[in-house]
């Protein structure tokens, strides 16, 4: 199945503690989850690893969020949108369903 959400896409959170916040996708995981910049921050208790020079303590980092809880953000309409696929000049492209604009990659 083709990926509707890709790395560097601007997305908006639809459900959860960060509902309504916007961010950029930094990583797409194969498990159907994504990591979004500045969204779903969790505190991780990091053990020190002197051999690697890693300091211990409580570190705040982004956790994965399910793809079903986010939607791509359409800058033209200013709202969350759905993605469709079509072929143009022999290439498969993504487009916004609300206004048929092609999503820039």
From Swiss-Prot:
Entry keyword ATP-binding: no
Q: What keywords appear on the UniProt entry?
A: Ribonucleoprotein, Ribosomal protein, RNA-binding, rRNA-binding
Q: Any stretches that span the bilayer, and where are they?
A: none
GO terms for biological process, alphabetical: translation
Domain of life of the native organism: Bacteria
| Keyword Metal-binding listed | no
Q: How does it assemble?
A: Part of the 50S ribosomal subunit.
Q: Which family does it belong to?
A: Belongs to the universal ribosomal protein uL24 family.
State what protein this is by name: Large ribosomal subunit protein uL24
The organism is: Vibrio cholerae serotype O1 (strain ATCC 39541 / Classical Ogawa 395 / O395)
């Amino acid at each position: 199945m083709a990926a509707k959400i890709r790395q560097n896409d601007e997305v908006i959170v639809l459900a959860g503690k960060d509902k309504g916040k916007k961010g950029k996708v930094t990583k797409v995981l194969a498990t159907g989850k994504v990591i979004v910049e500045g969204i779903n921050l969790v505190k991780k208790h990091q053990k020190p690893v002197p051999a690697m020079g890693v300091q211990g303590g409580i570190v705040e980092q982004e956790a994965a969020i399910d793809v079903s809880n986010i939607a791509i953000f359409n800058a033209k309409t200013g709202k969350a949108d759905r993605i469709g696929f079509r072929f143009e000049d022999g290439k498969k492209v993504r487009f916004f369903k609300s206004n048929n604009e092609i999503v820039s990659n």
